Protein backbone atom coordinates (compact mmCIF):
# COMPACT_ATOMS: atom_id res chain seq x y z
CA UNK A 1 0.00 0.00 0.00
CA UNK A 2 1.61 3.24 -1.15
CA UNK A 3 1.15 6.54 0.65
CA UNK A 4 -1.75 8.55 -0.81
CA UNK A 5 -1.70 12.29 -0.10
CA UNK A 6 -5.49 12.30 -0.41
CA UNK A 7 -6.11 9.75 2.36
CA UNK A 8 -8.59 10.77 5.06
CA UNK A 9 -5.90 11.35 7.72
CA UNK A 10 -3.88 13.59 5.39
CA UNK A 11 -7.07 15.57 4.72
CA UNK A 12 -7.67 15.90 8.48
CA UNK A 13 -4.08 17.12 8.95
CA UNK A 14 -4.59 19.74 6.21
CA UNK A 15 -7.87 20.88 7.81
CA UNK A 16 -9.96 19.74 4.84
CA UNK A 17 -12.00 17.38 7.02
CA UNK A 18 -12.99 18.38 10.57
CA UNK A 19 -12.15 16.34 13.64
CA UNK A 20 -12.56 16.55 17.38
CA UNK A 21 -8.99 17.34 18.41
CA UNK A 22 -7.71 16.05 21.71
CA UNK A 23 -4.09 17.13 21.33
CA UNK A 24 -1.78 18.51 18.68
CA UNK A 25 1.91 19.32 18.62
CA UNK A 26 4.59 19.79 15.99
CA UNK A 27 4.74 16.07 15.15
CA UNK A 28 1.36 14.50 16.02
CA UNK A 29 -2.39 14.91 16.11
CA UNK A 30 -4.76 13.03 18.44
CA UNK A 31 -8.50 13.08 17.76
CA UNK A 32 -11.71 11.17 18.45
CA UNK A 33 -12.63 8.32 16.12
CA UNK A 34 -15.80 9.02 14.09
CA UNK A 35 -16.97 5.41 14.56
CA UNK A 36 -15.92 4.66 18.14
CA UNK A 37 -15.68 1.06 19.30
CA UNK A 38 -15.76 2.19 22.94
CA UNK A 39 -16.03 5.36 25.01
CA UNK A 40 -12.91 7.46 24.51
CA UNK A 41 -11.87 5.74 21.25
CA UNK A 42 -9.14 8.01 19.88
CA UNK A 43 -6.56 8.01 17.11
CA UNK A 44 -3.00 9.33 17.22
CA UNK A 45 -1.38 10.04 13.86
CA UNK A 46 2.00 11.44 12.87
CA UNK A 47 2.15 14.58 10.78
CA UNK A 48 4.91 12.88 8.81
CA UNK A 49 3.73 11.12 5.65
CA UNK A 50 4.19 7.43 6.44
CA UNK A 51 1.98 4.51 5.52
CA UNK A 52 3.38 2.07 8.08
CA UNK A 53 5.55 2.01 11.17
CA UNK A 54 8.45 0.84 9.00
CA UNK A 55 8.44 4.12 7.03
CA UNK A 56 8.22 6.41 10.06
CA UNK A 57 11.32 8.29 11.23
CA UNK A 58 12.66 7.57 14.71
CA UNK A 59 11.81 11.12 15.83
CA UNK A 60 8.21 10.83 14.62
CA UNK A 61 7.85 7.39 16.21
CA UNK A 62 9.04 8.77 19.56
CA UNK A 63 6.66 11.72 19.25
CA UNK A 64 3.75 9.38 18.50
CA UNK A 65 4.47 7.30 21.59
CA UNK A 66 4.71 10.42 23.76
CA UNK A 67 1.29 11.50 22.47
CA UNK A 68 -0.11 7.99 22.98
CA UNK A 69 1.03 8.12 26.61
CA UNK A 70 -0.47 11.60 27.07
CA UNK A 71 -3.84 10.54 25.63
CA UNK A 72 -3.83 7.25 27.56
CA UNK A 73 -3.18 9.10 30.81
CA UNK A 74 -6.05 11.48 30.06
CA UNK A 75 -8.36 8.54 29.26
CA UNK A 76 -7.50 6.83 32.51
CA UNK A 77 -8.07 10.02 34.51
CA UNK A 78 -11.05 11.45 32.63
CA UNK A 79 -12.94 8.24 31.91
CA UNK A 80 -11.85 6.23 34.90
CA UNK A 81 -10.41 3.62 32.54
CA UNK A 82 -8.47 0.91 34.32
CA UNK A 83 -6.57 0.14 31.12
CA UNK A 84 -6.42 0.89 27.43
CA UNK A 85 -6.00 -1.04 24.20
CA UNK A 86 -3.31 0.29 21.87
CA UNK A 87 -3.50 -1.11 18.36
CA UNK A 88 -1.41 -0.38 15.28
CA UNK A 89 -1.91 -2.11 11.92
CA UNK A 90 0.80 -2.31 9.25
CA UNK A 91 -0.26 -3.26 5.72
CA UNK A 92 -3.39 -4.64 4.14
CA UNK A 93 -2.65 -8.17 5.40
CA UNK A 94 -2.86 -6.81 8.96
CA UNK A 95 -6.17 -5.04 8.29
CA UNK A 96 -4.85 -1.53 7.59
CA UNK A 97 -7.33 0.35 5.39
CA UNK A 98 -6.02 3.94 5.40
CA UNK A 99 -2.57 4.51 3.86
CA UNK A 100 -1.38 6.67 6.78
CA UNK A 101 0.08 5.32 10.01
CA UNK A 102 -2.26 5.51 13.00
CA UNK A 103 -2.15 4.37 16.61
CA UNK A 104 -5.54 3.49 17.99
CA UNK A 105 -6.60 3.92 21.63
CA UNK A 106 -9.69 2.06 22.77
What do the predicted segments below correspond to?
Residues 1-104:
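HIT superfamily nucleotide-processing domains
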